[in-house]
Design a protein with these regions (language model features):
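A transmembrane-helix-recognition feature enriched in membrane-embedded lipid enzymes
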Residues: 1-35
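Walker A (P-loop) phosphate-binding motif
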Residues: 23-87
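Active-site regions of enzymes building and remodeling cell-envelope glycoconjugates
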Residues: 34, 83-87, 107, 145-148, ...
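Conserved beta-strand elements of the Class I
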Residues: 68-70, 149, 221-225
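Phosphate/Mg2+-binding loops and adjacent switch elements
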Residues: 73-191
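A short, gly/pro- and small-residue-rich
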Residues: 144-158, 166-170, 195-202, 278-298
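C-terminal accessory "lid"/substrate-recognition subdomains
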Residues: 156-270
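Short, flexible loop segments at boundaries between secondary-structure elements
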Residues: 251-255, 286-312
Length: 312
C-alpha cells in the first residue's frame, strides 16, 4: 500500500490515521458474515442520516431483504452492552435514535459502543440478510461493503475546518472514497450525488388518536420543541407550512420533562419524532408529533436502490 496516499488529503486513497492503521494491518478489522452498509457523515450531526436509514430499511424490506440495524446508542445509560432494541425499549437506556429506528422500521436494532460487537450480537439473535450501521463511518474496525454519506445541502461543510475549529470529522477529500453521496435539501452540489428532501407527514397526538395534516395548522401559533442537532431545521419546516412557531430548542438528545411541555396556555405543542419517543409518559393531549420522511423523485430513488443492491 502507498503510505503517501494514505496520508495525502488529495489522494483518492486518503484516510484518517485510524483507517490507515486498519488498512496497514496494524489495527484489527472484522468482517461479518453478512453485508454491512454504513450510513454516516463527515460532519457533526444533523444531516438527515436517520430519515435516510428509515427510508433505506423500508425500501430493502419491500424487496424481500431481512434488515437489521446497529447503532452506538448515544446517550443511552444501560449498564451492559450490546443491548437489543425494539419498539418497546426505553430510550433512556438504549438511546433515542435506536428506539426511533426500531419503531419506524420494525427492524431489530442492536446498540453498543463497539459496532463489531453490535453486529455479532445482531447476527446471533436474528436471521438477517444485511446490516445497516447507523453512523460509524469513522468506526474502522468494522469492515463494510458499502459506505453512504449524507450531507446537509444547506450547511454543507460549514467553515471547512476539522473539529474542534469546524464541523468536519474527516477531510472533505474523504468523499472521493465513499460509494454513495446523498445531499439532503439545500443547494450544495457534489458530482454524482443523489438529491433528496425532507417532507413532513401528517401530525398525530402522542396521547390520543387524532391525526391532522400539517397544512391544517396553517396560521396557527404553536410551541415547537426540538432536541436535535439542528433545531432550526425543524422550526423552518413548520414555518414553511405557514405555521406561527414559538421556538424552544433543546440540546441534542435532551429528555423533555413535564415542565418542558407546559407553557401555561392552550396552544398546541409540536415535537420531533426523536423527542416523541422520550416524552410519551409525560405528554398532555395537546402535544403532537411531527413525523418526517425523505423523498427522492422516482427515477433517482430507483437508481439509488439499484446502485446499492449492485454493491452488496
Amino acid at each position: 500500500m502507498n503510505l503517501n496516499g494514505c496520508w495525502n488529503g488529495d489522494s483518492k486513497h486518503s484516510r484518517t490515521g485510524k483507517k490507515c492503521l486498519n488498512q496497514l494491518g496494524l489495527k484489527a478489522t472484522t468482517t461479518l458474515s453478512i453485508p454491512v452498509i454504513v450510513v454516516g457523515n463527515i460532519t457533526v450531526g444533523g444531516t438527515g442520516k436517520t430519515p435516510f436509514i428509515i427510508w433505506l430499511a423500508t425500501e430493502l424490506q419491500t424487496r424481500g431483504y431481512r434488515v437489521g440495524i446497529i447503532s452506538r446508542g448515544y446517550g443511552g445509560k444501560a449498564d451492559n452492552w450490546p443491548q437489543h432494541v425494539d419498539s418497546s425499549s426505553d430510550p433512556q437506556l438504549d438511546g433515542d435514535e435506536p428506539v426511533l429506528l426500531a419503531r419506524a422500521t420494525g427492524c431489530l436494532v442492536v446498540v453498543a459502543p463497539d459496532r463489531v460487537a453490535a453486529g455479532q450480537a445482531l447476527i446471533a439473535k436474528e436471521q438477517i440478510d444485511v446490516i445497516l450501521s447507523d453512523d460509524g463511518l469513522q468506526h474502522y474496525p468494522l469492515n463494510r461493503q458499502l459506505e453512504i454519506v449524507v450531507i446537509d445541502g444547506e450547511r454543507g461543510f460549514g467553515n471547512g475546518l476539522s473539529l474542534p475549529a469546524g464541523p468536519l470529522r474527516e477531510p472533505k477529500s474523504r468523499l472521493v472514497d465513499v460509494d454513495i453521496v446523498i445531499v439532503n435539501d439545500g443547494s450544495w452540489e457534489h458530482k454524482g450525488a443523489f438529491r433528496t428532501k425532507i417532507v413532513a407527514q401528517p401530525v398525530y397526538q402522542i396521547i390520543g388518536s387524532r391525526q391532522k395534516s400539517l397544512e391544517g395548522f396553517r396560521n396557527t401559533t404553536v410551541h415547537a420543541i426540538a432536541g436535535i442537532a439542528h433545531p432550526s431545521r425543524f422550526f423552518d419546516l413548520l414555518e414553511a407550512a405557514g405555521i406561527n412557531v414559538i421556538r424552544h430548542p433543546l440540546p441534542d438528545h435532551a429528555k423533555p420533562d413535564a415542565a418542558t411541555l407546559a407553557f401555561g396556555d392552550d396552544l398546541p405543542v409540536f415535537v420531533t419524532e426523536k423527542d416523541a419517543v422520550k416524552c410519551q409518559s409525560i405528554c398532555h393531549e395537546n402535544v403532537w408529533c411531527v413525523p418526517v420522511k425523505l423523498e427522492f423523485d422516482a427515477e433517482n430513488g430507483d437508481r439509488l436502490i439499484q446502485s446499492i443492491l449492485t454493491n452488496l
